[in-house]
């Protein structure tokens, strides 16, 4: 009878009739429920997203089944969906210790480590993402049933992002190009690659990739500001200003401090000191920006560049009153005082 029952359960599993399996097994007496049948019941509850019930049943057959990969996988699977990653990891690793070629365990552990890689700390994120990559690679060699291309692309993107955060731009570039080789042709990957290349001072290559991003349809403040700054870095300030104007037109905010700072540098390169001063003074006339350290520092620098040391001193002293006390400020105070004494 039990053989016939298990055969019927297997057929219902193929048809994904999990509620029928639950109803049928729950109707049995305790004597008729051996560990194999209870394991099937646990799996059925798991498919119905009743993970606490799944664990309860699995615990009841722990003595006879905990040395099997399927029991450990089911425990890991349940804890994964109960958002308990440490327990999920423990059982999935045990499943693979018993059977290293267990496809579901390799796949789920890869997903788990991928998710654990979504953290701010770059070194720790890289640690988890590399683990995820390793398990996906094992899974891919086991006659994989799932298409993992998008997962692999996502991991390569995140590895690149974290290496860029660590300023390891060469390693980041390797992962960005790997993502592209896997089929990633989205705006994000080329935006990141362009930023990466600019960080490596490979400006012409960066500009080529920024143009690729535009061709893919992205047109926003960040992109045009990045292009502008790249042109500024290769000493093409007029082109830089043209793109900065596009960036400002698309800015979602009235005052974008990052744009203002970059625009000021570009205007100085064009010897448009008065225009830079006018732009910054217009912003600091607003109550919320009147004590902005960065803007006031820019004004002081512009006046020093103009050799208007009295005006420069006004802003340097204001910066000191606001609490700035660093090498830049002290060096420029000494410079200004020395010029005014002559």
Locate each region found by the language model:
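Start-of-helix register in tetratricopeptide repeats
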Residues: 3, 36, 70, 104, ...
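Residue-level detector of the short coil/turn that links helix A to helix B
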Residues: 16, 49, 83, 117-120, ...
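Flexible helix-coil transition and linker loops at the boundaries of alpha-helical arrays
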Residues: 27-32, 63-67, 136-152, 249-254, ...
